[in-house]
Amino acid sequence: MKTIRVSVVTPDGPVYEGDVEMVSVKAKSGELGILPGHIPLVAPLEISAARLKKDGKTSYVAVSGGFLEVRPDKVTILAQAAERAEDIDVLRAKAAKERAERRLQSQQDDIDFKRAELALKRAMNRLNVAGMK
């Protein structure tokens, strides 16, 4: 079966590099499935799991926003943060989730609710992806 090259890159460096049969991501416009030979495309990404399918197996990468660039022979995910499912520290992700929930529940005026909501989404995404490995 044909494959397409995938790179998941963050400001800290590469997270994933390999050839897969299909890439599935959640863009702002909805769910996208990319196969080899896909038309060129650039799309902003949601905080979600990128699913990388090869040989009947699926690998998961927690992606915290960013952009997807598709060319017929290559997919690049430029993310603010990304972690492979097997690399996620579940205890750290749970602690981040609890911190974000406490910030959202506090009644202080100086709390930036949008930032706290994003932190909660990122932590929940990491926990969900860690459970997929």
UniProtKB/Swiss-Prot annotation:
Organism, scientific name: Geobacillus thermodenitrificans (strain NG80-2)
Gene3D superfamilies named among the record's database cross-references: ATP synthase delta/epsilon subunit, C-terminal domain, F0F1 ATP synthase delta/epsilon subunit, N-terminal
Q: Which GO terms describe its cellular component?
A: plasma membrane; proton-transporting ATP synthase complex
Family, as annotated: Belongs to the ATPase epsilon chain family.
Its record classes its membrane topology as:
Peripheral membrane protein
Its keywords, alphabetically, are: ATP synthesis, Cell membrane, CF(1), Hydrogen ion transport, Ion transport, Membrane, Transport
Task: Tell me what this protein is called.
Answer: ATP synthase epsilon chain
Its quaternary organisation is:
F-type ATPases have 2 components, CF(1) - the catalytic core - and CF(0) - the membrane proton channel. CF(1) has five subunits: alpha(3), beta(3), gamma(1), delta(1), epsilon(1). CF(0) has three main subunits: a, b and c.
Q: Which NCBIfam families match?
A: ATP_synt_epsi, PRK00571.1-3, PRK13446.1
- Name where it's found: Cell membrane
Function as written in the Swiss-Prot or TrEMBL entry? Produces ATP from ADP in the presence of a proton gradient across the membrane.
State which gene encodes it.
Answer: atpC
What terms describe the molecular function in GO for this protein?
A: ATP binding; proton-transporting ATP synthase activity, rotational mechanism
